[in-house]
Regions:
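N-terminal secretory/targeting leader peptides
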Residues: 1-48, 55-189
């Protein structure tokens, strides 16, 4: 149907009523709260949930509704993100000059650049091919992604970095939501 970026924009515009997505709504509509999706900030899902359900999470959700015209219906835990490569990675210094495949998430790119890696934004459908052809030396993702993409066929090492508590958001366009009957709104929230 469209990329994550396009679907997020369409949901903000009311062209799509609901979406299941990653951190794009925060990145676009509440960038000051993007730390919720930044590497090495949250130690586990319980920690994430405590902060998300607290005052900072409330402010982040309010900003997404105000600026992005979307309401968070829920959060889905997608696992901890790990790294794959063809060389062992024991310390952050070993990612120096490594071409690391990343999604087009500004915060993630900035963090990995700060660690000395050379981020290569590659769409997820091209992940396997990019590693096989050497366009990227390494990748990062949750274990389900690593397994389902069969990255063991093109990468010899898996490093359990747990560098990001990966969550996904389920959001509804606020204009669409407000037009629903109160009982239907209650079913959604």
């Amino acid at each position: 149907v469209g990329s994550e970026e396009e679907i997020n924009d369409w949901c903000s515009q009311g062209k799509v009523e609901m979406q299941a997505t990653g951190g794009r709504p925060l990145e676009v509509s509440a960038p000051q709260y993007f730390f919720f999706n930044a590497p090495y900030v949250m130690k586990d899902f319980e920690h994430f949930t405590r902060v998300w359900n607290g005052p900072l999470g409330k402010k982040a959700k309010e900003q997404v509704e105000k600026n992005g015209k979307q309401i968070y219906v829920g959060i889905v835990y997608r696992g901890l993100r790990q790294m794959t490569s063809n060389v062992p990675i024991y310390t952050p210094a070993e990612v120096y000059k490594m071409k690391l495949r990343l999604p087009t998430v500004k915060t993630w790119i900035a963090v990995w650049k700060g660690l000395g890696a050379e981020p290569v934004p590659i769409p997820l459908p091209d992940l396997y091919k990019s590693l096989k052809e050497g366009k990227a030396d390494a990748s990062e993702g949750d274990l389900t992604q690593i397994s389902s993409f069969k990255l063991n066929e093109v990468q010899s090492h898996l490093t359990m970095t747990n560098h990001l508590v990966q969550t996904g958001g389920i959001l509804i366009n606020s204009g669409f939501f407000k037009k629903l009957a109160k009982k239907d709104q209650g079913l959604i929230l």
